[in-house]
């Protein structure tokens, strides 16, 4: 199969594995893995892809691959990753795989210099190349740019963002202090906003959009950082293997002893906000020695330090202090920041217990007194006020007027704990806002022409337990994925269609319904959550119930017990919900959703913190007193500031900014869950590539044009350098001349209606044209002028030649018209007078023989006069007949009657002469005359026989034409009947198509949900029982990895495919048949066709055999080599007819299966695709011959003028023959296509077909057909 070429087939853990096709099934292919000879498994046919011939080859741009599909994309990334080439392009999109180690000199200053001003694709893929492209686009297009760095947590987004910022400031900075400040801002932001998670040691727990602003000279003048959604819940609690924000650990590990004493710091295990997570520091061998023992937690002392090449808490503290100094923070302000951070830690150590009184409140535990004192001192609060504010809440009554009585309500232990945590979150979030503001103050700018923005925001997150933070992060990623879909897929395809480029449409999953579910007005999850917050007694359970109630049948929303993970099935319906995101289904536990959505403190704590004695603490809260209060909130109720809608507003503003700028994309990929170098988990990576839209982009870029410029834009760029004669040119003509002058290959670009477009990998050529320095433009103008002169001279030459050719053509046509006219006239005259001419010739021949009669008579001795008289009478009769034929319009029958009478007379006369002739000499002469007459008679009979044969052939042809006309009339009647029915079923078909589209979307979503569940399960969760049966390749909770068998994987793939419409139709038809052949192998079908005597089984096998051939050829056509010509096993007119007129599957000809099937023969013109446009005069036109034995083709021939005939017979050459049945080809409806058997057999024999078929029969390769049976009878 497939000429022994390898293919990629699905693999549960590696994504794909290489194998060979060994059999074609109903809707699957049987694959033999290359590394497991003798073992086979089945794979859905749409999940199998052809592989590159050289499996070790890698390319820098995936669009350069010979086969563009997700398997070769994954393999190319894998090969490059094994060579430490972590960057790869898909057109102008960069794929970055996290290496988890520092590649030497890869991001050095020398590397930066190397990429400056270089076009995309001229150097190996690099994040620097994308940064430089964004800069050049900004400079040339006079438009701000955005670089969207996306990917899941741990994929390397933060590091790539830092590299982009560093590249822009080093390459295009002014060389002043501001360049360093932009770069040094990152360590400070990371210290306060990054933390260790399960999947990432340096995970950004906030989103940021960093703008680098440029002046009119395109030099860096300043920057601005916008931040989004800091994860505040992490301040109070973390997972077992996770940590709080880096700043806490760096302060504990690296702070000098004097600062440590001032802040009352100790080891991380001493603080509630740190000791419930991981309390180990990141450290190297050197820094581990520098950390004092009393700063290390027991866990650290037992297990040692955490290792990461980019993190070192002790060393990073010093680097953070240096960064603070560089961005302008003095020692006092630095100490203020540390003081608030320490205050938050001590605040977390305040504990409560039930009060002994009847008030039902609580009091501080005795052992919490030191923590209370430290916290109050560090935050500038009164100790007693802090105690009271944490254990009571102030309420105002409205008795009879606006002013009311202040009432202090005691808080229970749980409420006091919540109040303490809320205060800690608020203080830290305000501190983080202050840090970002100070960062922005350190690189101000007065004027800005354009900016380049770099977006680094938390990637799609999915854990065993997901809360409000993951909900907001994933909502953000849904919006960004939609932006990617619109910018790269939707807008790109709309532009191609508008410009008339004829690029094939690429389908992608639209996630607008998921976004509407979250943000729709009144019924969206965010608005429902806000309404819940405004209730007097809000609850998470009520909120969850309302969400399920308002979106009961929504495809994207589901209840937890439908999760594919067992841990989620224990969650009650009012405790969570599942949202099916673009990357897969995530189960959110709604506990604390209501609390986390409210960013406001209760009145007691708000008043306390705003009246702090510490100036720095007061400043943190001055700008946030009532700015964010909910305008719908009524007086007297608890204050409410919606976190969700605030984030939604920020996100919409961000997307408006992204839509107004040019876009570049960096898709970051994490290679494995263990966060180790040189370990490639193909299944994980494939899922990330599919979710990020890379596979759809690859499909689009097969015929896409990622670079473009408008004609007017190019023309205006060159206009001031153009001489007057060139300035008059139309912009489109000027662009054409420009490209020709540069010698660009026409296949590398394409002209639209208003723009010119460039193929992927041709960015260097595009940049050469768009380069705007005066010397370069002037040089190109010279080239254009030279090309125009040459092209116009060539045009004059071609015009002269064309006029001469036209003159010759007119003369030729005139002579051809005369030739046609005289030929037609000749034919008409011939048809009219041919019988008479033939009759005259025959009669004249008879008259010539009278001389011989006279010679005989002259030799007679007696009866000469009487005999002469008889001869004269005969001669008179002949002359009379000739005159009659000449002067009278007679039919052939009349002429033959006259002629036969004369022949009889002459024969009677001859008989009489024979009686009279006695001598031998005379008898011999008479004998000779008789022989001549006998020859004449035989000649006449042969001629008559030939004439009748010609008449018979004409009759057969007329019968064939009459039959074709009858079939055409019947077809027209059927079509009229179908049109009558079509109106009734059209709506039904439209509904079915819509349902199928939705069903395919559901299948795709289920696949992503299952993959996401598998990825979560690999971190330690357990799949549900049903999913475990499907996904045997998962790591279960006990850590044992089970490999999915080939049969299990095939079953899963087949189940996914079996719901498709074509397969359902086939299976429904198969169910109605007597024989179920769905599980038969391809070879079994072929052998049965060759050997079976069961007519019904034979017909069923033939039908299934050719159906599988059609499926296989469709797969080959879809997965052909890039830019390769489509294989043609039949003329294009035949295949086009089959595509445009799909025939319904009929029920076995109503079981009428005849042994002697009808034999039909056809001939139609055939021109090879490669010669279609090279040969306008059809000099290379060939002929395609086909012999159909019943509905299926038995023999096939291709005759071309410049190559040897191609002979094919059924059985031996099935893969190269037309796989369509006779009805599907439409040949019976083509006028003049059907020929006589004799015409086919003559050509077949002349081309050596008999010997070819005989060899196939002898080698047992030919399938038994009418042709093989006739040849075998002939040989016998």
Swiss-Prot record:
PROSITE patterns: IQ, MYOSIN_MOTOR, SH3_LIKE. Residues 782-810 are annotated as: Required for binding calmodulin. One of its GO terms (biological process) is endocytosis. Residues 813-842 form the IQ domain. Residues 934-957, 1117-1151 are annotated as: Disordered. Residues 273-317 are annotated as: Responsible for slow ATPase activity. It is a peripheral membrane protein. Residues 1107-1109 are annotated as: Interaction with OPTN. InterPro entries: Kinesin_motor_dom_sf (IPR036961), MYO6_lever (IPR049016), Myosin-VI_CBD (IPR032412), Myosin_head_motor_dom-like (IPR001609), Myosin_N (IPR004009), Myosin_S1_N (IPR008989), MYSc_Myo6 (IPR036114), P-loop_NTPase (IPR027417). Keywords: Actin-binding, ATP-binding, Calmodulin-binding, Cell membrane, Cell projection, Coated pit, Cytoplasm, Cytoplasmic vesicle, Endocytosis, Golgi apparatus, Hearing, Membrane, Motor protein, Myosin, Nucleotide-binding, Nucleus, Phosphoprotein, Protein transport, Transport. It holds the Pfam family MYO6_lever. ATP binds at residues 151-158. Residues 2-53 form the Myosin N-terminal SH3-like domain. Phosphorylation in the motor domain, induced by EGF, results in translocation of MYO6 from the cell surface to membrane ruffles. Phosphorylated in vitro by p21-activated kinase (PAK). Residues 917-984 are annotated as: SAH. Residues 665-672 are annotated as: Actin-binding. Residues 1051-1267 are annotated as: Interaction with TAX1BP1 and CALCOCO2/NDP52. Changing residue 1088 to A: No effect on binding to OPTN. Belongs to the TRAFAC class myosin-kinesin ATPase superfamily. Myosin family. This is Unconventional myosin-VI. It comes from Gallus gallus.
